[in-house]
Amino acid sequence: MSTPKKTYSSTSSAKSKAHSVRVAQTTADAALQAVFEKSGDSGDSFDYSKSVSKSTAESLPSGAVTAYLQRMQRGGLTQSFGCMIAVEGTGFRVIAYSENAPEILDLVPQAVPSVGEMDTLRIGTDVRTLFTASSVASLEKAAEAQEMSLLNPITVNCRRSGKQLYAIAHRIDIGIVIDFEAVKTDDHLVSAAGALQSHKLAAKAITRLQALPGGDIGLLCDTVVEEVRELTGYDRVMAYRFHEDEHGEVVAEIRRADLEPYLGLHYPGTDIPQASRFLFMKNKVRIIADCSAPPVKVIQDPTLRQPVSLAGSTLRSPHGCHAQYMGNMGSIASLVMAVIINDNEEDSHGSVQRGRKLWGLVVCHHTSPRTVPFPLRSACGFLMQVFGLQLNMEVELAAQLREKHILRTQTLLCDMLLRDAPIGIVSQIPNIMDLVKCDGAALYYGKRFWLLGTTPTESQIKDIAEWLLEYHKDSTGLSTDSLADANYPAAHLLGDAVCGMAAAKITAKDFLFWFRSHTAKEIKWGGAKHDPGEKDDGRKMHPRSSFKAFLEVVKRRSLPWEDVEMDAIHSLQLILRGSFQDIDDSDTKTMIHARLNDLKLHDMDELSVVANEMVRLIETATAPILAVDSNGMINGWNAKIAQVTGLPVSEAMGRSLVKDLVTDESVAVVERLLYLALRGEEEQNVEIKLKTFGTQTEKGVVILIVNACSSRDVSENVVGVCFVGQDVTGQKMFMDKFTRIQGDYKTIVQNPHPLIPPIFGADEFGYCFEWNPAMEGLTGWKKDEVVGKLLVGEIFGMQMMCCRMKSQDAMTKFMIALNTAMDGQSTDKFTFSFFDREGKYVDVLLSTNKRTNADGVITGVFCFLQIASSELQQALKVQRATEKVAVAKLKELAYIRQEIKNPLCGITFTRQLLEDTDLSDDQQQFLDTSAVCEQQLQKVLNDMDLESIEDGYLELDTAEFEMGTVMNAVISQGMTTSREKGLQIFRETPREINTMRLLGDQIRLQQVLSDFLLNTVRFTPSPEGWVKIKVVPTRKRLGGSVHVVHLEFRVSHPGAGLPEELVLEMYDRGKGMTQEGLGLNMCRKLVRLMNGDVHYVREAMQCYFVVNVELPMAQRDDASSQM
């Protein structure tokens, strides 16, 4: 059930909200199951649609819910296509088995055992006595493994008959459960235990999946269902996606032509209970061979306290409710695979916790009994892992798009506030309906109404506002997908047109509203339409009755309000509420400073220290580092790169990287690196080859693995590229020689020479056969401790393996790389990380190559590791720290830019109020000066694209203005600082300047003159100092009545003047760029855009800026304008 949210939150509340939804859904699941079981006992029919609606409103005692969950996991029944035996964790003593186990295992019936017969199965039997010696060895090895699932399936043979079976083992709380399935002659037989062998079956599907372009989840889902159907042969394969409210949707489907389509079907959350979803997280591939077959009872040790858990068993029997559902839709067999992705949530401390969540399911249905062998099911499960990886990337891409949406929304909010707030946000375009997806919106302000789209009537909105003030008076707003569930008394009067609402309080009695219609309006089902003569039986469990039940559940409910939408609404609310406060409110200032402190930004001194440390590291690093400017010319060449190439620093500087220094085969690679890096796209782990010079020439080329880093100035403009490299020449030579050797490779692999990289290998069955000395040194594990173990599952894995990996995604990527090599395709420089024997985190690059025999047949895989030097790691660490500081500074700038706009709106509003009063001439002049200063501030705040100023293609405004107004505004901006320093500002301008009307960009002219004036004031000695601004106009006739005015502005002051470095920064010749230097630099470029120029002159007694611009005079009809 939906509950209203009284305050707005973002991702920090998502986890608790999702938990609440799941708890409520579990209760509904239990209630629905209770109704089903009760109807079966009494003989009454089970009305599915009505029961679903009723279950969502019922509450059950916690004991009843717990009992329901226990039955789901410990039902005591299995399917008949295999058998189950549970044994103790040590000793293999049988504690439970399915009744059909003797038959499946070809044992003598228990009722008439022969004298001395060992092949009997009962509680207490040692299960090892039932299988051959080699089978027992395999089972014992699996029992010792930490990650047992990666060893499945284990091929075993019955001792008596020799019958071959797949054993699928997993651990439970009291021991080990082993499922046995017969190996059929037409099965995809794997010749050894382990997941790696099974995964080969999905190689083609994985290759196709990885080749898909990004940004299209629909195409990804369509491809997955196609590949799964080709692998398994089921009549129908669908991809289900779970929505935030736990209901599901069919987003992709491939089916037999005569079957009814279900694409687009939405179904209530109870169709796949929470308990089942939990089981899918544990057992990710679930098969039902024949839902009509009678289940098999499990016999267990009577001393056990509760039924054996079958949560992870491949044979767990379907519950009656689900079996009936399948039968009603004409499906006899099914295969369901979990699609699991990362789930990043912020905890209460603000740190990100990475978990896993069920995104959806890939479901296969068949109209007749069907059993898919375990190796193929395992391959499908691995395909789902790859699918989950692809989905993770798509989700991250969607998150980036969401970030862009937030930025666009913030721009929209600022645009709204430049108007007549708050009326402008509903009376102009765009308006508040463009802020979030809705069917209607309203502003209730000062007992007046502004309505947009589909909304309640004015009287109904007033009633909602009064209800909010009475029942939610302590909240800043309310959002709900159901006004009825939020207990609004008159919700029934609003109809289907208004179900969901988000309300934001902007004053003590005024509100903004957004409204949404019922969800059913948004739902479209692509299924076949009913014949008018047919009647649905909504009482039966069937996809159509599920759809009907879903529509019944959501008929008075809208789509939920997403967190990003509530953040946008909350932002607008805060800004609007702030616009009704005094702009000098000290609380606002306190809030701004507190926010800045929370960002924990480094100051400029700390940034300088980091930068200096970075330079020192680059110059002294034993890693080769080089840098180029935007034209590709060398402007950085450290001692290490000079050493390995034989080219001294003095000879390298100024040479072209592409034309002079890289080999011909690397030209295209380096050109691409430069092109991308100069656009801000940084590539990593790219191999390039450099020429050698002098004494190094005889050694041949230098091979580097480089990371390309964009070099930026303080304005975040890319001005060059830095390459941080690792010299792998020696390792590459050995690797090339190694892969060319046809016979004995031991002399290379086992050579302890430091240039030999860490190397390990696995045979075609996934067992480690090579682990060289460098690998021993890197991991801490000796060769004799790992050889013979499964590479994935015993050496590398998620649990207490020899080399534990950090995440499931990392292990999946490793397995993909191994499978790719087994398929004959090498993987080069793949990022690979694990924990060594001492628990130290190791971060390396992995390259894989196929291993072949003399006939060219692939017999395994070789893996080579490349380790980054400590100097390179430190240099990259400092680089990341510098980038982090830069990002933090940008966040601070963006925040300040946003917060300045709010009080600026208040200033504008106050000035507009004053303009409507009776003012003297002096007062009117003050207001005019204030107005143009506001315009200047607004212009600067909107300067998001400094690059256009630097490159000289910024479009200047052209409008008529009065020069006297400009001078008043310029001088007013310098008055506060000059008074603080005890300086006087003298203004020397001809009288005609005050009334001279010109054409041009008034605000930009005002901006540059005020910047030059303020810098002059800052560097004038005080007290008793002075600053003088002088204007000399010269009129010119261009022909006819067209005149231009050449204006020379001279801003002078006594003393030593501006620091020389600051003046150099103005001319782009400084070593760095300070904030003051950046301002002067931008102003000089703005002057040049006006076809003017600026100089700074030093004389014996004074220094001064000289600014020359030429502007056309405005055409006047009166005679005074004529020469």
Swiss-Prot record:
UniProt binding sites for phytochromobilin: 321
Domain PAS residue range list: 610-681, 744-815
Oligomer status and interactors: Homodimer.
Listed Low complexity bias regions: 1-15
InterPro entries assigned: GAF, GAF-like_dom_sf, HATPase_C_sf, His_kinase_dom, HisK_dim/P_dom, PAS, PAS-like_dom_sf, PAS_2
Entries under SMART domains matching the protein: GAF (SM00065), HATPase_c (SM00387), HisKA (SM00388), PAS (SM00091)
Keyword set, alphabetical order: Chromophore, Cytoplasm, Photoreceptor protein, Receptor, Repeat, Sensory transduction, Transcription, Transcription regulation
PROSITE patterns for the chain: HIS_KIN, PAS, PHYTOCHROME_1, PHYTOCHROME_2
Protein name as it appears in the record: Phytochrome 1
UniProt region (Disordered), positions on chain: 1-20
Subcellular location field: Cytoplasm
PTM info: Contains one covalently linked phytochromobilin chromophore.
GO molecular function, one term: photoreceptor activity
Family: Belongs to the phytochrome family.
A GO-annotated cellular component: cytoplasm
Function, in words: Regulatory photoreceptor which exists in two forms that are reversibly interconvertible by light: the Pr form that absorbs maximally in the red region of the spectrum and the Pfr form that absorbs maximally in the far-red region. Photoconversion of Pr to Pfr induces an array of morphogenetic responses, whereas reconversion of Pfr to Pr cancels the induction of those responses. Pfr controls the expression of a number of nuclear genes including those encoding the small subunit of ribulose-bisphosphate carboxylase, chlorophyll A/B binding protein, protochlorophyllide reductase, rRNA, etc.
Residue span, GAF domain: 216-395
Main location: cytoplasm
UniProt key word Nucleus: no
GO process terms (BP): chloroplast avoidance movement; detection of visible light; red, far-red light phototransduction; regulation of DNA-templated transcription
Annotated Histidine kinase domain residues: 895-1115
Pfam families: GAF, HATPase_c, HisKA, PAS, PAS_2, PHY
